[in-house]
Swiss-Prot record:
Pfam families: HCR (PF07111). The keyword Oxidoreductase does not apply. May be a regulator of keratinocyte proliferation or differentiation. Residues 62-74, 208-218 have a biased composition (Basic and acidic residues). GO terms for biological process: cell differentiation; protein export from nucleus. InterPro entries: HCR. It is found in: Cytoplasm; Nucleus. Keywords: Coiled coil, Cytoplasm, Developmental protein, Differentiation, Nucleus. GO terms for cellular component: centriole; cytoplasm; nucleus. Residues 62-82, 191-218 are annotated as: Disordered. This is Coiled-coil alpha-helical rod protein 1. Residues 82-314, 344-435, 498-691 form a coiled coil.
Length: 782
């Protein structure tokens, strides 16, 4: 026995307890904690891969353990080798158990997959059964629809018969209504024509009254124009007389008055004349405005004839006393021209009235014919619409027959499809029966496998319990060996390196504690996995039993549904035969009805065609008559238009000749006026040369200044001294100047009156020039 090395008595049990691990690399492998309790089938491959990757970790851990065991020294190799062998055996046992667990998991996954496939097959079979039920319902509904279509065809046939009778009655009623409406329209047209004739007569009377009023207004306007012409001629004569007086006075004043007095008087006269000119310009503006207003009034009241007459009267003035024959000729020509124009106007008015009457008559005839044509076209449209309605009804009947034929064809197609569906349903039922039998066999085999696995579970439990006991024994042996090794170390002399021994002890203790923890953890994990496998197997067994029961129930239901489907197929076949027979009878009835309706429609169409032909012949006859009357009216209108055009051409030719004559007369009068002005200028020049004007001025001065002449004589006869002989002419000159001043005041008054007359004359001359310009403008335009 080795003596104790420092401590007396027995070793306490706390010495063999597990201590906290201090180093991380000597911990148990982490792959044991990563194993799931129940792995789904989708993640089994992942778990297998994880285990495959963790196997080298186990080997590495074993190597580490073996290397750790070799480190302490030669003294503890014997018990370390024994512990490593035991651990390797335990690891092999654990690996075998893990392989068995994997195999069980694979079997469970296969069972789940097969159960899912069976569920899918059963669901597909249920869907097929539902489709068969739907097809059966569709066949029933189609049979009911065929029956309803047959009933509807009978109702349509009855409705068509009733509709044909109603249409005949409506056609008769419409014919009577059309006749009554035509008579009413004819009466209304007659009444409207009479009312139109009365209105036209009233309008004619009103037009005649208007024409009479316009003639009166024209006569009044002509009278006013003649008065204005007379006034203008008088004013022109007065102006000419005043112009001559003014010229004479100017000449007299220029000869008698000296230069200085003449300049002073001239300035005064110029100022007064400027003032008078301003007044005269204002008066002239007002007179021009009044003259323009009068001209507008004359132009609005009179026609082109009045303007031409006015021009002729203006050109031929009564003051022209040198050519009385020319004035008489102009007056005679003007009167003849007036008479011709009046006759032409009367003829044109009569022709216009006749033309308007004929046009109104023709318009009335055309309107009546148009009304007749519109009424006949309406009748024709009504008949055409009735024909279209009947044709539409026939088409509707044809469409209904086509629809029935289509329904029959659809029914046949549905029957054919029903037969195909029944055949396919029978085949599917056979397939379902085979699939159910095969699935039942497979379930039985899987249940046997599951029972075998459940029978193997107690043996596995025994193995696990044996392994746990073995682990406990190994743990006790290891503890005993460790205690013995410690006693030996204590009894042995201390080696020189105390630190190495203490380190080895700590490492051994740590390794012991780690191995204990690993063994406990592995035992716990194995127990958990076994419990999970048991629970999973029992749950899957229960599920499979439930699925088997459900499949048996579904098989019973499918067999029952197959039996009912067979009965329904027989019923459907019988109904199909009945429907085919009914369809054949309906086809025969439809052909008969089509023949009857075709005959009736042909008869109706023939009657309507005869009526329409008669009406068309009547309308054509009336249209031909209307066309003839219209052609006659057009011919008469063209004749009237030709006459009117000829008369218009004649009137235009007359106007052109009259204008040419008037232009020639105007030119001749202008030349005559120029000659008269030239003669007047010559007369004035001769008078000035002979001194007649100076004599008139002297006589005027003598009459104005008698007193001055008397005084002059007294002064000349009185004795004068010789001293005053030189001042005598000066004294004589003074009274002559004073007398000249008085005579000048009188002359200025006269000149004011003459200037006023001259301004009036100039205004009148300007108005005449404006009238001539206005008269020349329409002549140029014409």
């Amino acid at each position: 026995m080795f003596p104790p090395s420092g401590s007396t008595g027995l070793i306490p049990p706390s010495h063999f307890q597990a201590r906290p691990l201090s180093t991380l690399p000597r911990m148990a492998p982490t792959w044991l904690s990563d194993i799931p309790l129940v792995q789904p089938p989708g993640h089994q491959d992942v778990s297998e891969r994880r285990l495959d990757t963790q196997r080298p970790q186990v080997t590495m851990w074993e190597r580490d353990v073996s290397s750790d065991r070799q480190e302490p020294g030669r003294r503890g190799r014997s018990w370390g080798l024994e512990g490593s062998q035991a651990l390797s055996q335990q690891a092999e046992v654990i690996a075998r158990q893990l392989q068995e667990l994997r195999r069980l998991e694979e079997e469970v996954r296969l069972l789940r997959e097969t159960s899912l496939q069976q569920k899918m097959r059963l669901e597909a079979q249920a869907m097929e059964l539902e489709a068969l039920a739907r097809a059966e319902k569709a066949g029933r509904t189609e049979a009911e629809g065929l029956r309803a279509a047959l009933a509807g065809a009978e109702v349509i046939r009855k409705n068509l018969e009733e509709g044909s009778q109603r249409e005949l009655e409506e056609v008769q009623r419409l014919h009577q209504e059309q006749l009554s409406s035509l008579t009413q329209a004819h009466e209304e047209a007659l009444s409207s024509l009479t009312s139109k004739a009365e209105g036209l007569e009233k309008s004619l009377s009103s037009l005649e009254t208007r024409r009479a009023g316009e003639a009166k207004e024209l006569a009044e306007a002509q009278r006013e124009a003649e008065l204005l012409r007379k006034q203008l001629s008088k004013t022109q004569e007065d102006l000419e007389a005043q112009v001559t007086l003014v010229e004479n006075l100017r000449k007299y004043v220029g000869e008698q008055v000296p230069s200085e007095v003449h300049s002073q008087t001239w300035e005064l006269e110029r100022q007064k004349l400027l003032e008078t000119m301003q007044h005269l310009q204002e008066d002239r503006d007002s007179l021009q405005a009044t003259v323009e207003l009068l001209q507008v009034r004359v132009q609005s009241l009179t026609h082109i004839l009045a303007l031409q007459e006015e021009e002729l009267t203006r050109k031929v003035q009564p003051s022209d006393s040198l050519e009385p024959e020319f004035t008489r000729k102009c007056q005679f020509l003007l009167n003849r021209w007036r008479e011709k124009v009046f006759a032409l106007m009367v003829q044109l008015k009569a022709q216009e009235l006749e033309h308007s009457d004929s046009v109104k008559q023709l318009k009335g005839q055309v309107a009546s014919l148009q009304e007749q044509v519109t009424s006949q076209s309406q009748e024709q449209a009504i008949l055409q619409r009735s024909l279209q309605d009947k044709a539409a009804e026939v088409e509707v009947e044809r469409i209904g027959a086509k629809g029935l034929q289509l329904e029959l064809s659809r029914a046949q197609e549905a029957r054919h499809r029903w037969q195909q569906q029944t055949a396919s349903a029978e085949e599917q039922l056979r397939l379902v029966v085979n699939a159910v039998s095969s699935s039942q066999i497979w379930l039985e085999t899987t249940m046997a496998k599951v029972e075998e696995a459940a029978a193997q579970l107690p043996s596995l439990n025994n193995r696990l319990s044996y392994a746990v006991r073995k682990v406990h024994t190994i743990r006790g042996l290891i503890a005993r060996k460790l205690a013995l090794a410690q006693l030996r170390q204590e009894s042995c002399p201390l080696p020189p390196p105390v630190a190495d021994v203490s380190l080895e002890l700590q490492q051994l203790r740590e390794e012991r504690n780690r191995l204990d923890a690993e063994l406990q953890l592995s035992a716990r994990l194995i127990q958990q996995e076994v419990g999970r496998a048991r629970e999973q197997g029992e749950a899957e067994r229960q599920q499979l039993s439930k699925v088997a029961q459900q499949l048996e129930q579904e098989l019973q239901q499918t067999q029952e549904s197959l039996a009912s489907l067979g009965l329904q197929l027989e019923v459907a076949r019988q109904g199909q035969q009945e429907s085919t027979e009914e369809a054949a009878s309906l086809r025969q009835e439809l052909t008969q009805q089509q023949e009857l309706y075709g005959q009736a429609l042909q008869e109706k169409v023939a009657e309507v065609e005869t009526q329409l032909r008669e009406q068309l012949s009547d309308t054509e006859r009336r249209l031909n008559e209307a066309r003839r009357e219209h052609a006659k009216a057009v011919v008469s209108l063209r004749q009237i238009q030709r006459r009117a055009a000829q008369e218009k051409e004649r009137s235009q030719e007359l106007r052109r000749l009259q204008e040419e004559a008037r232009k020639e007369e105007g030119q001749r009068l202008a030349r005559r006026l120029q000659e008269l002005e030239r003669d007047k200028n010559l007369m004035l020049a001769t008078l000035q040369q002979e001194g007649l004007l100076s004599r008139y001025k002297q006589q005027r001065l003598l009459t104005v200044l008698p007193s001055l002449l008397d005084k002059k004589k007294s002064v000349v006869s009185s004795p004068r001294p010789p001293e005053c002989s030189a001042s005598a002419p000066i004294a004589a000159a003074v009274p002559t100047r004073e007398s000249i001043k008085g005579s000048l005041s009188v002359l200025l008054d006269d000149l004011q009156g003459l200037s006023e007359a001259i301004s009036k004359e100039e205004a009148v001359c300007q108005g005449d020039n404006l009238d001539r310009c206005s008269s020349s403008n329409p002549q140029m335009s014409s």
